């Protein structure tokens, strides 16, 4: 079952508790997040409410049901200064509100649960929705030359591959 904010507001602890009391889970995948990196700088409390408090609400309910929690996180928990890809053993050092609040959410999971997976993705793309690849293809169809940043290192993540990993 896939839920939207209309189905479940993860920032509402009572709503989360009621939802979990009405459903039984072996696994719970959280894709909900405040993801507008730039806007988060001016909406700190909203970003924290969704990315940290909401995650805590879900983690507590997963703990009550002994359900394995799968959290979709981000490479923004790192400072981006490494010249090589990050690994799960690298120490987080977020440099913006988005990264800080996603790290806070990860911390809530780690302190609450024994059964969890945190999947840190970056540059997510697919044939659906809005993403960098689709934007570049669209703009490239209209222009003979594209100006894009070239000082970032990342690992594009195909959404279907990520979904397959989660299902395994």
Language model regions located:
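NAD(P)H-binding glycine-rich loop region in Rossmannoid oxidoreductase-like domains
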Residues: 10-50, 63
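NAD(P)-dependent short-chain dehydrogenase/reductase
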Residues: 107-167
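Catalytic helix-loop patch of NAD(P)-dependent Rossmann-fold dehydrogenases
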Residues: 42, 49, 54-57, 77-119, ...
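Conserved mid-core alpha-helix of short-chain dehydrogenase/reductase
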Residues: 15, 57-61, 108, 161
